[in-house]
């Protein structure tokens, strides 16, 4: 989000912790973490507890765990149960099981019930499932939906499917719960109920895993409308493979403008340093073939030839003729004739 400037920032009294905190919080709320950090650090030096709380969130967000520990420890050790819980999370992220466990237990003993889930989750991640259940169950029975879902996973892994189902149904406002219910009913071959829960997870809670399952389901069932719907939801979250699949669909429909747009989103997204894409799932030759056709339609002939050159899809006569027709429609008759001739020898 664009930085929002506030008046008189240069005239702030450094000893005014509350004012510094409010300035930092305003920047934080408006998406400027760098400026938020600057003022929250000054407020934290004056012992402002809420400044430390937000500052720790910023450092956790950017994985600056040593800084988060530095600001949290003094106040956490003074008995603040929320900061004890957050410090437990810092140590969990640092894979320091003993200190994470210590601070979560400290927070629980000081009355912070949310730490029951966090400690249960810690035990779960370190494969201490019996201990995880000991802390998750009281939290789940107090309507902590994250605890209900994680407890259900443990019961499911232990073969206690009925117990898993019971706790998933208790988590009424949790997309992961609906996704897991869909998975559970799918394994029971109750496809109608599975689909119902998966669609709730995908459409209402924007659950990515449910969207992935559903687009594949509808692709297998030749339901193009719903396949496109769930691919579009995934694309909205920058799921790179979905751009390629949508591009392929639109290319097959001769909607080359939309196909080109989706392929371009894929190529641009793939360049990002944090891009996650499994190229094993993508038919690169088909991608280049379809993108080449889009380029012809949009008059980008050099790009077209770059993608079509030595493409394995041009070993099929009908595909060669399709490309030739596109060049003919684009009034590139010389190239069209070359493709028509080559189709005779495929």
Where on the chain are the PLM-derived regions?
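Short helix-capping/linker turns of helical repeat alpha-solenoids
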Residues: 15, 46-48, 78-80, 110-112, ...
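Flexible helix-coil transition and linker loops at the boundaries of alpha-helical arrays
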Residues: 8-13, 269-282
């Amino acid at each position: 989000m664009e930085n929002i400037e506030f008046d008189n920032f240069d005239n702030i009294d450094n000893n005014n912790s509350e004012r510094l905190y409010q300035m930092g919080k305003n920047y934080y709320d408006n998406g400027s973490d760098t400026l938020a950090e600057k003022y929250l650090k000054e407020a934290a030096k004056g012992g402002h507890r809420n400044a430390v709380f937000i500052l720790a969130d910023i450092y956790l967000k950017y994985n600056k765990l040593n800084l988060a520990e530095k600001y949290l420890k003094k106040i956490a050790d003074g008995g603040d149960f929320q900061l004890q819980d957050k410090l437990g999370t810092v140590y969990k992220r640092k894979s320091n099981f003993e200190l994470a466990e210590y601070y979560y237990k400290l927070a629980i003993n000081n009355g912070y019930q949310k730490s029951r889930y966090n400690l249960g989750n810690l035990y779960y991640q370190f494969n201490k499932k019996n201990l995880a259940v000991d802390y998750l169950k009281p939290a789940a029975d107090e309507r902590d939906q994250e605890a209900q879902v994680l407890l259900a996973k443990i019961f499911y892994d232990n073969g206690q499917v009925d117990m898993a189902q019971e706790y998933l149904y208790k988590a009424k406002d949790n997309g992961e719960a609906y996704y897991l219910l869909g998975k559970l009913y799918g394994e029971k071959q109750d496809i109608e109920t599975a689909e119902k829960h998966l669609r709730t997870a995908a459409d209402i809670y924007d659950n990515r895993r449910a969207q992935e399952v559903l687009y594949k389901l509808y692709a297998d069932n030749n339901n193009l409308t719903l396949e496109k719907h769930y691919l579009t939801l995934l694309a909205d979250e920058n799921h790179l493979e979905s751009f390629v699949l949508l591009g392929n669909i639109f290319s097959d429909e001769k909607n080359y403008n939309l196909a080109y747009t989706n392929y371009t989103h894929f190529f641009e997204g793939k360049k990002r340093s944090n891009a996650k894409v499994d190229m094993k799932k993508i038919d690169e030759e088909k991608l280049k073939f379809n993108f080449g056709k889009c380029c012809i339609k949009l008059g980008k002939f050099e790009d077209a030839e770059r993608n079509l050159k030595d493409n394995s899809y041009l070993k099929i006569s009908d595909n060669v003729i399709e490309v030739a027709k596109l060049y003919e429609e684009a009034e590139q008759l010389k190239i069209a004739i070359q493709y028509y001739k080559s189709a005779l020898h495929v």
